[in-house]
Amino acid sequence: MSKKSTESDAGNTEKQWSLADFEIGRPLGKGKFGRVYLAREAKSKYIVALKVIFKEQIEKYKIHHQLRREMEIQTSLRHPNILRLFGWFHDNERIFLILEYAHGGELYGVLKQNGHLTEQQAATYIASLSQALAYCHGKCVIHRDIKPENLLLDHEGRLKIADFGWSVQSSNKRKTMCGTLDYLAPEMVENRDHDYAVDNWTLGILCYEFLYGNPPFEAESQKDTFKRILKIDLSFPLTPNVSEEAKNLISQLLVKDPSKRLSIEKIMQHPWIVKNADPKGVCASIDI
């Protein structure tokens, strides 16, 4: 990476950022490669999240390519349900990503606190994700790692896709294992070529998890999880009570043949989504 950092935004003006431009606040989270802090741009007082990644960790885990790809992809995307990456800078030891601040934090925390979501909340988030993925797929971006930990909520309860570390910008089929075990599509488990349909599969997994509190193919071991995924060992518990329309959507997404999964467009037109999703994508009543 060059010593200079660029923010190509309105008017294509380039801003050279440094740590002196920010007032650093409380820590927001900690990851494998660094930490995230609440921060405020000193001049404008604009609140952001500052993701700090240690270069030593980048070297240790050999994630140069993955990080560069994440930065390039996320900087280029502009969608209300995708977290903005405003720019980046670095010093001798660290790389700093300047990110949109999502006041509500991780959807994962909300899900664990509440056990599961209501059908209205779940449908709203699946609709928001579908719109964001339709946009990504239109830009030849496959996310490949959508999970509650990678989904943030803003102050209104609007969903934001946050982590593009496993994303890939490609119009061709790919053949690498990535993403999180419980969310992997069968073609990825078998290390077969995969395309945009892996994201459609993940929408089915998430819809199930939103409504029941756990992913559908969860098992004691990785081997057993993979077996359940490949068998499409799908069952719907009696509690909590979930509508047949919701189960219908999930069943049309968790299909082994990628070409037979419900398309993003059809997801957004599904009766359960139309009936339950908030058109503005807001879940103001959710406890964040």
Curated annotation (Swiss-Prot):
CDD domains: STKc_Aurora. The gene is AUR3. GO terms for molecular function: ATP binding; histone H3S10 kinase activity; histone H3S28 kinase activity; protein serine kinase activity. Inhibited by hesperadin. Keywords: ATP-binding, Centromere, Chromosome, Cytoplasm, Kinase, Nucleotide-binding, Nucleus, Phosphoprotein, Serine/threonine-protein kinase, Transferase. Phosphorylation at Thr-176 may regulate activity and degradation of AUR3 in a cell cycle dependent manner. One of its GO terms (biological process) is phosphorylation. It is an enzyme of class 2 (transferase). The active site is at 145 (proton acceptor). The modification Phosphothreonine is found at residue 176. Phosphorylates in vitro histone H3 at 'Ser-10' (H3S10ph) and 'Ser-28' (H3S28ph), but not at 'Thr-3' (H3T3ph) or 'Thr-11' (H3T11ph). Colocalizes with phosphorylated histone H3 during mitosis. Associates with cytoskeletal structures that are necessary for cytokinesis and with the microtubule spindle. Its main location: cytoplasm. This is Serine/threonine-protein kinase Aurora-3. Overexpression of AUR3 induces mitotic spindle defects, but the distribution of phosphorylation of histone H3 on the chromosome is not affected. Induction: Expression peaks at mitosis. Belongs to the protein kinase superfamily. Ser/Thr protein kinase family. Aurora subfamily.
